[in-house]
Amino acid sequence: MSAKFYICRHCGNLVGVIHDSGVPMMCCGQKMEALEPNTVEASGEKHLPVVTVEEGAINVRVGSVNHPMVPEHFIEWVYVQTEHGGQRKALKPGDDPSVTFCLGDDKAVAVYAYCNLHGLWMTEL
């Protein structure tokens, strides 16, 4: 099962689904919009997660060219989907656009990065 994320276009709330019962996600009295990765017209070289796998961990850098990390334009979070669940790490302006996830014996299957301007980006592993 792939990860699912939704956004409220009214207030900006973001939701990551743990269990999908099929009921529409609602916020501010309206249906939330499903985020589809890699669909916004923007530079993939600055948005696609670049992943290196090491024993028990993965390192993720957002972009083959570092993504900007300024208040107007930054990566808000990175999420790694694994065979048994997932992990998320938050970033803020001024941070380096890279994170490390310790996975133990779990296996990563996809990595997502969310840009405050250009939406959701994903690399399948």
What are these regions (language model features)?
Residues 5, 24, 112:
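Residues immediately within or flanking Cys/His clusters that coordinate Zn2+
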Residues 8-11, 27, 115:
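Short cysteine-rich clusters marking metal-coordination/redox-active sites
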Residues 17-21, 35-38, 123-125:
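Short Cys/His-rich "knuckle" micro-motifs
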Residues 21-31:
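Cysteine-rich micro-motifs
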Residues 62-70:
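Short amphipathic, basic-aromatic surface patches that mediate peripheral association
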Residues 97-101:
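Short strand-edge motifs at loop-to-beta-strand transitions and within beta-strands
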Residues 107-117:
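Short, aromatic- and glycine-rich surface loops/edge beta-strands on solvent-exposed regions
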Residues 116-124:
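Short acidic/polar inter-strand loop motif in beta-rich domains
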